[in-house]
Curated annotation (Swiss-Prot):
GO terms for molecular function: manganese ion binding; RNA binding; RNA-DNA hybrid ribonuclease activity. It is found in: Cytoplasm. The lineage of its organism: Bacteria, Pseudomonadati, Pseudomonadota, Betaproteobacteria, Burkholderiales. It catalyses: Endonucleolytic cleavage to 5'-phosphomonoester. Signal peptide: none annotated. This is Ribonuclease HII. It comes from the Bacteria. A divalent metal cation binds at D10, E11, D106. The gene is rnhB.
Length: 196
């Protein structure tokens, strides 16, 4: 008998100037609830890490997908976000061993999926599975930024996670761009054009 699995899907990293956009997909296990799921943006980094480990341990299945800076520059950030979400659902389905019945997507549009999907504005505050997906995406992306900081400490990625802050702008001005910067984003493009 096939179970009805509903997965939540959310992304992290649309706004940064560097790195991949990352999506998470999670099917929660009603027999193994996780307390305290909220939108990852409202949680401290320590709390997010704790909940991430709980999700890894207790969720029925989870998946991660991403779109690289090169893909973002090629197809634009919106399409890259949809691609990352689709990849996250595909990763979840591979781990689950079957496709979920439906995907609940945070936001106002859905990626092209081979299953039913529903967009829910502010879904990360309304649906626990979307909140869990938000946490998976955010922690995964933050870890990528910390690893990128090890390679390029001069940019301060571990502090601002690639977002367009004054410190990031100052580093761009001083050091130029690295290979992981999104060249289609205006501040990075201005550095490349010498007009920053």
């Amino acid at each position: 008998m096939n179970m009805i699995w509903v997965c939540g899907v959310d992304e992290a990293g649309r706004g940064p100037l560097v790195g991949a956009v990352v999506a998470g997909a999670v099917v929660l296990d009603p027999e193994n609830p996780i307390e305290g799921l909220k939108d990852s943006k409202k949680l401290s980094a320590v709390r997010r890490e704790f909940l991430y480990e709980q999700i890894m341990e207790k969720a029925k299945a989870w998946g991660v997908g991403e779109a690289s800076p090169t893909e973002i520059d090629s197809i634009n950030i919106l399409q890259a976000t949809m691609l990352a979400m689709r990849r996250a659902v595909e990763d979840l389905a591979a781990r689950l061993g079957e496709w979920p019945s439906k995907a609940l997507i945070d936001g106002n549009r859905c990626p092209e999926l081979s299953i039913a999907a529903e967009a829910i504005v502010k879904g990360d505050t309304k649906e626990p599975a979307i909140s869990a997906a938000s946490i998976v995406a955010k922690v995964t992306r933050d870890r990528q930024m910390i690893a990128l900081h090890e390679q390029h400490p001069q940019y301060g990625f571990s502090q601002h996670m690639g977002y367009p802050t004054e410190a990031h702008f100052a580093a761009l001005k001083q050091y130029g761009v690295c290979t992981e910067h999104r060249k289609s984003f205006a501040p990075v493009r201005r550095v490349l054009e010498g007009s920053f």
